[in-house]
A protein has these predicted regions:
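A short, glycine/Asx- and small/polar-enriched loop/turn
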Residues: 103-108
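Alpha-helical elements of Rossmann-like donor-binding domains used by nucleotide-donor carbohydrate transfer enzymes
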Residues: 6, 32-35, 81, 110, ...
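C-terminal glycine/acidic-rich active-site capping loop/insertion
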Residues: 139-208
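Rossmann-fold NAD(P)-binding glycine/threonine-rich loop
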Residues: 1-17
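Active-site beta-strand termini and strand-to-loop segments that position acidic
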Residues: 111-117, 137-140
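Glycine-rich phosphate/pyrophosphate-binding beta-alpha loops
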Residues: 76, 123-131
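Short acidic/polar mixed-charge low-complexity motifs
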Residues: 88, 116-118, 142-143, 184
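Predominantly a Rossmann-like dinucleotide-binding segment in NAD(P)-dependent oxidoreductases
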Residues: 14-17, 24-102
Length: 208
């Protein structure tokens, strides 16, 4: 944290811009959820839940400080997604735990961000064995659910590079149910927005 403060202070003193690599703002699952929210079909939002879970029950001993846990390692991305949508919350509560190996920093967390009547829940666990939604959003007029995570990282691990056929391929859809202006219940399969981590640099260019 002190190093980050030093960097931002240095940038401000020299009139420069410094930014972390917030690539998760350009996950396909997040961009799709964002588009649904911005469509207004859900009405006034009351709750959004974000999960980044997997099943890895064994954790080798790897002691470290809080900066080595999941809250600082992954939460900086999933919390940033929420903040990019709604800004700074009115108040926050959180629960950090180490469940697989007590010698290690936190591997499980839940943060709750409150914006008036809207509550945003951000969770990560390595002890979730069933398929659980990546995003769940509820509003006065409807609900949206998206299973499955962005596949760009999976493609990169398989040596499929950006621009190549099949990069980030994902044929899943989101499920949207809402009440339209005629009072009718509408069900929609929402196609995925295209994820693109390269847009981080486009956004930085626009800022500069």
């Amino acid at each position: 944290l002190e190093e980050a403060k030093t960097l931002f202070s240095l940038a401000n003193s020299k009139g420069l811009t410094v930014t972390p690599y917030q690539n998760r703002r350009f996950d396909s699952c997040f961009l799709t959820t964002k588009k649904v929210i911005e469509s207004g079909k859900l009405g006034e939002l009351v709750e959004i839940e974000s999960h980044f879970d997997n099943y890895r029950p064994v954790a080798e001993t790897n002691p470290g400080g809080p900066q080595n846990g999941e809250f600082y390692g992954l939460g900086v991305h999933t919390l940033d997604q929420i903040i990019s949508l709604f800004g700074r919350p009115d108040h926050v509560s959180y629960d950090l735990r180490s469940l697989r190996n007590k010698a290690n920093p936190d591997d499980t967390f839940e943060a709750q961000l409150f914006y008036g009547d809207l509550k945003a829940i951000v969770k990560t666990s390595h002890l979730v064995q069933i398929d659980y939604p990546k995003f769940i959003v509820h509003g006065h007029k409807g609900s949206f659910v998206k299973y499955g995570i962005d596949q760009q990282e999976t493609s990169l691990k398989a040596n499929i590079m950006p621009g190549e056929p099949g990069f980030g391929a994902d044929d899943s859809v989101g499920e949207l149910v809402y009440v339209n202006e005629a009072g009718e219940t509408v069900r929609e399969a929402v196609p995925l927005e295209t994820g693109d981590y390269g847009r981080v640099y486009d956004a930085l260019y626009d800022t500069l």
